[in-house]
Amino acid sequence: MAPRTSTTIGVDTPFLLAHTLIEHPNHASARAWLAYFLANNTSLALCPIILDEFIHVVTDAKRFENPLSMDQAISVVRDWLHSKENVLQLPTEESIKLQYDWLLGYRLGRKRIHDTEIAAIYCQHGVTRILTSNARDYSVIEGIETFDLSAQPKAI
């Protein structure tokens, strides 16, 4: 497990969506959060599942008036991956075990599998803070702190 740094925050899929799509209701706040992170030397943790979810959602014409093409979505993901401010956090054997322990221990159902996986990956890499618009997805997991994407940035 990587050492915990107080200047890393995990991002959830809603942040990537809001930052990318002008039509997203949290677009301005996502941009404000990113500016805040950059000004405060805060690294952003990403994990594969949020990138996959981003591609799945941002290309869906039923959700957005102007969805991205698959090529555009993958280009956005590659830009995030190549940014020096970002750290890719990969699943580990320990994070997988933790995910299943949490699913059973907190009695979570099938609709919480991905959120629990995201939290477990970040936690195993020492990241216990997540920027999201879905705080309730993580609220039951002890030790995970969420920051509201729709709110103005605040000290982390």
Model-derived regions, located:
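Short beta-strand segments at enzyme active-site cores
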Residues: 45-48, 132
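Short, well-structured N-terminal submotif of metal-dependent ribonuclease cores
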Residues: 1-10, 14-46, 61-75
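Active-site neighborhoods of divalent-metal-dependent phosphate/nucleic-acid chemistry enzymes
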Residues: 2-4, 86-133
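Histidine- and aromatic-rich ligand-binding microenvironments
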Residues: 12, 111-112, 134, 147-156
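Short loop/helix-cap segments at secondary-structure boundaries that form the rim of catalytic
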Residues: 136-144
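Active-site-proximal, substrate-binding regions of enzyme catalytic domains
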Residues: 58-88, 96-102
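Structured helix-beta-strand junction loops
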Residues: 40-41, 83-84, 141
